[in-house]
């Protein structure tokens, strides 16, 4: 049997290599072996959220898998035919639900009937997109290009206890050709300022600060407040401006106003580039761009984006052309499939 062998320590050598490789292995029916998994990280090998993501894909394609345990630095994934089914996956920690969703998303392009998965873990955790970004930026953009999904957030989960719960539905999808270079210039900034097990005044302070800062920029803020109870405690704010996002997670000792300011600044920096996609969406879109072809505009090319292109090229006969883009007061890059 011929395996695609992928070096998991390439560039930033993170979990994204595993997510993209396993997803594309299931989609293309090509077996893959990933070596040196997260070799440069302090905690080497697979983390619980990676194990959960691989298990989810394994369920959907009856794969044979070797090395699927926390800490494993080598993983072999041998897929069979995709056969959608409903199931529940419990990451068992505050491991990121968003990153499991990222792994399942491309499978929409290879299934013949819908599946629904209940995922338990962390909805709003460090080093992962917040669940409201996934819902209002990632999935919305992909829906416009034919990727059909629904996401319901039932409970929020924060580090370390987790306890978040979502229902994620994926339907058979046919990807359209991408043509998404410049931002729409929409002035509407929507958002959610949320707290769990904390005083509502914190959410109100985050919203007030964000609204004041956005008004100064002549933008139109529409930010909702959400207060909930759960087994974990946390706060944060997520903003979105059509196809761009900005967010910040609350931390002990970090004033509500600072949290809001960081989220607003992140969004404004992305808006300044004039490009359609922010740096996070720039890497998430790569597998879909490979299948749909076409061109997208991004604010910057990150190592995550380069890594995703590199992994995709192991499975698909595609090449990506990156060019600087300076038209119409924009300052970013285009990525085109050639």
Swiss-Prot record:
Stored CDD domains: RNA_Cyclase_Class_II
The enzyme's E.C. designation: 6.5.1.4
Binding site for ATP: 102, 280-284
Signal peptide, first to last residue: none
Compartment(s): Cytoplasm
EC class (word): ligase
Reaction catalysed by this enzyme: a 3'-end 3'-phospho-ribonucleotide-RNA + ATP = a 3'-end 2',3'-cyclophospho-ribonucleotide-RNA + AMP + diphosphate
Active site: 304
Entry GO CC: cytoplasm
GO biological process, one term: RNA processing
Listed InterPro entries: RNA3'-term_phos_cycl_insert (IPR013791), RNA3'_phos_cyclase_dom (IPR023797), RNA3'_phos_cyclase_dom_sf (IPR037136), RNA3'_term_phos_cyc (IPR000228), RNA3'_term_phos_cyc_type_1 (IPR017770), RNA3'_term_phos_cycl-like_CS (IPR020719), RNA3'P_cycl/enolpyr_Trfase_a/b (IPR013792), RPTC_insert (IPR036553)
UniProt keyword annotation of Transit peptide present: no
Entries under Pfam families matching the protein: RTC, RTC_insert
GO molecular function: ATP binding; RNA-3'-phosphate cyclase activity
Main location, first listed in the record: cytoplasm
Keywords: ATP-binding, Cytoplasm, Ligase, Nucleotide-binding
Function: Catalyzes the conversion of 3'-phosphate to a 2',3'-cyclic phosphodiester at the end of RNA. The mechanism of action of the enzyme occurs in 3 steps: (A) adenylation of the enzyme by ATP; (B) transfer of adenylate to an RNA-N3'P to produce RNA-N3'PP5'A; (C) and attack of the adjacent 2'-hydroxyl on the 3'-phosphorus in the diester linkage to produce the cyclic end product. The biological role of this enzyme is unknown but it is likely to function in some aspects of cellular RNA processing.
Family statement drawn from the similarity comment of this UniProt entry: Belongs to the RNA 3'-terminal cyclase family. Type 1 subfamily.
Name of the molecule in the record: RNA 3'-terminal phosphate cyclase
Source organism: Methanocaldococcus jannaschii (strain ATCC 43067 / DSM 2661 / JAL-1 / JCM 10045 / NBRC 100440)
């Amino acid at each position: 049997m011929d395996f695609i062998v992928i070096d998991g320590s390439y560039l930033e050598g993170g979990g994204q290599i595993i997510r993209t490789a396993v997803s594309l292995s299931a989609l293309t029916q090509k077996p893959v072996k990933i070596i040196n998994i997260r070799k440069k990280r302090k905690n080497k090998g697979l983390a619980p959220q990676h194990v959960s993501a691989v298990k989810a894909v394994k369920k959907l394609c009856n794969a044979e898998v070797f090395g699927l345990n926390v800490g494993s630095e080598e993983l072999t994934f041998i897929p069979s035919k995709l056969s959608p089914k409903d199931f529940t996956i419990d990451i068992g920690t505050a491991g990121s639900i968003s990153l499991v969703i990222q792994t399942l998303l491309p499978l929409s392009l290879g299934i013949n009937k819908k599946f629904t998965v209940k995922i338990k873990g962390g909805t709003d955790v460090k080093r992962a997109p917040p669940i409201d970004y996934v819902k209002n930026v990632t999935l919305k953009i992909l829906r416009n290009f034919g990727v059909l999904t629904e996401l319901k957030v039932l409970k929020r989960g924060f580090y370390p206890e987790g306890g978040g719960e979502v229902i994620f539905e994926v339907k058979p999808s046919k990807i359209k050709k991408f043509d998404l270079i410049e931002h729409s210039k929409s002035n509407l900034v929507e958002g959610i300022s949320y707290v769990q097990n904390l005083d509502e005044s914190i959410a109100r302070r985050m919203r007030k600060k964000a609204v004041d800062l956005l008004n100064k920029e002549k933008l139109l803020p529409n930010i909702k407040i959400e207060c909930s109870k759960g087994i974990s405690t946390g706060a944060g704010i997520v903003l979105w401006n059509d196809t761009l996002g900005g967010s910040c997670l609350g931390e002990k000792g970090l004033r509500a106003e600072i949290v809001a300011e960081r989220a607003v600044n992140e969004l404004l920096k992305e808006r300044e580039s004039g490009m359609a996609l922010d740096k996070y969406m720039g890497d998430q879109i790569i597998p879909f761009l490979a299948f749909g072809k076409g061109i997208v505009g991004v604010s910057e090319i990150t190592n995550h984006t380069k890594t995703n292109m590199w992994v995709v090229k192991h499975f698909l006969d595609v090449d990506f052309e990156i060019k600087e883009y300076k038209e119409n007061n924009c300052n970013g890059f285009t990525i085109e499939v050639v």
